């Protein structure tokens, strides 16, 4: 069992100055989190000297592992030249052209600093382009922390949203409509019944923050069809899946091209970044070309963009996705064997380098995930931490693999699962 005495002391100090003792709610492990001292490869070390095999990987960005030497050198080289100018740089052109070459949905793009900014700006652009107000999101789909998308999942097929946080007036979310994932009939009905004022559909092609939950059959192609037929802008939020499922993200993996795409996490090489892009006629609405305003002091941050160029270059040159797919398949097969041997009513979900053990039946949507044993998973999380394996502390978060995870790491991890799954 790990001891966390120094982490507890830090948490006691932190909660006096930081709400909940953390800078983001997902880090608020109960009764207190471990505090990280360093990380390298697939290992993360806390201030008490405990070392863990890491399957959070900063919740997705570190597909090449922590402290990748190529990315590290790119950051150092840029820091020597300065790290914030307030002027355009050639780095933005280099990374922008590379992204556009990999994502057919992107003719033009803009760099921002976070995934939240990317989805917020994409929705604003879609509304400005269509001169319409309403949009559809998927129940349980996560698109950052801006007001319009912080909406509770409804119990029916579709609901007019109510805010999922205090401080958001209901008027801010009255144009946010929800449907269940993998329910094309509900999607079609809500689009067609609101067609006169329907601007966009925003969705994670693979639900990452309650999963991963995968599209069934031709669901994504059917969503593409109904949005095209009704002149609705389709936005794929690929902040998680971009550069993770394939170089061209989920849209390459599943063969579906949206009108707009948002990116983040991996494309910044582990530094803060966001991207929104799409068809030229939509992006030309963005200021200063058009009348949809968007701006940011740190947009196109040279250090972040330099790290992103390095990360994308390594991913492309080393053709990592085939290896990651094989690693993911190996791990998921091992987990399925353990669950079968123990005769547990659990489901192993995942795709490529994303995976999760659901403490319940196979989920197709948000309502299914809510039926999973959340308390059982929480106990399992702590048991795995005591076995020096760091998983997301919530049943609702995806586990990630990196190129730094070795076969020996997977074997150690499966041994821990075999002991702790019950």
UniProtKB/Swiss-Prot annotation:
GO terms for biological process: protoporphyrinogen IX biosynthetic process. Its EC number is 5.4.3.8. It comes from the Archaea. PROSITE patterns: AA_TRANSFER_CLASS_3 (PS00600). GO terms for molecular function: glutamate-1-semialdehyde 2,1-aminomutase activity; pyridoxal phosphate binding; transaminase activity. Keywords: Cytoplasm, Isomerase, Porphyrin biosynthesis, Pyridoxal phosphate. Pfam families: Aminotran_3. The keyword Oxidoreductase does not apply. Its main location: cytoplasm. It catalyses: (S)-4-amino-5-oxopentanoate = 5-aminolevulinate. GO terms for cellular component: cytoplasm. It is an enzyme of class 5 (isomerase). It is found in: Cytoplasm. The modification N6-(pyridoxal phosphate)lysine is found at residue 265. Its cofactor is pyridoxal 5'-phosphate. Pathway: Porphyrin-containing compound metabolism; protoporphyrin-IX biosynthesis; 5-aminolevulinate from L-glutamyl-tRNA(Glu): step 2/2. Belongs to the class-III pyridoxal-phosphate-dependent aminotransferase family. HemL subfamily. This is Glutamate-1-semialdehyde 2,1-aminomutase. It comes from Methanococcoides burtonii (strain DSM 6242 / NBRC 107633 / OCM 468 / ACE-M).
């Amino acid at each position: 069992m790990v001891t966390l005495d120094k982490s507890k002391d830090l948490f006691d100090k932190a909660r006096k100055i930081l709400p909940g003792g953390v800078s983001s709610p997902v880090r608020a492990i109960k009764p207190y989190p471990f505090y990280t001292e360093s990380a390298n490869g697939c290992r993360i070390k806390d201030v008490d000297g405990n070392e863990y095999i890491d399957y959070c990987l900063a919740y997705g960005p570190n597909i090449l592992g922590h402290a990748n030497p190529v990315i590290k050198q790119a950051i150092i080289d840029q820091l020597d030249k300065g790290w914030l100018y307030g002027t355009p740089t050639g780095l933005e052109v280099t990374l922008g052209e590379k992204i556009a070459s990999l994502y057919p949905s992107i003719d033009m793009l803009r760099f921002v600093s976070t995934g939240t900014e990317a989805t917020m700006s994409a929705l604003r652009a879609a509304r400005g382009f269509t001169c319409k107000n309403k949009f559809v999101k998927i129940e349980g789909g996560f698109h950052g922390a801006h007001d319009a998308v912080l909406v509770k999942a409804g119990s029916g097929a579709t609901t007019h949203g109510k805010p999922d946080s205090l401080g958001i007036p209901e008027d801010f979310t009255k144009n946010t409509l929800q449907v269940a994932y993998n329910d094309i009939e509900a999607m079609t009905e809500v689009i067609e019944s609101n067609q006169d004022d329907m601007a966009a559909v925003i969705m994670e092609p693979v639900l990452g923050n309650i999963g991963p939950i995968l599209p069934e059959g031709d669901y994504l192609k059917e969503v593409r069809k109904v949005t095209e037929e009704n002149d609705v802008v389709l936005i794929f939020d690929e902040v998680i899946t971009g550069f993770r499922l394939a170089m061209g993200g989920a849209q390459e993996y599943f063969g579906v091209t949206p009108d707009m795409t948002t990116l983040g996490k991996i494309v910044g090489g582990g530094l803060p970044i966001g991207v929104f892009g799409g068809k030229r006629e939509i992006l030309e609405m963005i200021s200063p070309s058009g009348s949809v305003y968007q701006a940011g002091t740190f947009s196109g941050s040279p250090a972040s963009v330099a790290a992103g160029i390095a990360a994308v270059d390594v991913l492309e040159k080393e053709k990592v996705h085939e290896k990651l797919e094989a690693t993911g398949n190996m791990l998921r097969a091992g987990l399925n064997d353990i669950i079968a041997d123990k005769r547990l009513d659990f489901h192993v979900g995942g795709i490529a380098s994303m995976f999760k053990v659901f403490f319940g039946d196979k989920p197709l949507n948000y309502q299914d995930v809510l039926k999973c044993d959340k308390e059982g998973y929480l106990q399992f999380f702590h048991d795995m931490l005591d076995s020096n394996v760091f998983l997301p502390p919530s049943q609702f978060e995806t586990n990630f693999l990196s190129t730094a995870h070795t076969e020996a790491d997977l074997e150690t991890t499966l041994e821990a699962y075999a002991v702790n799954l019950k």
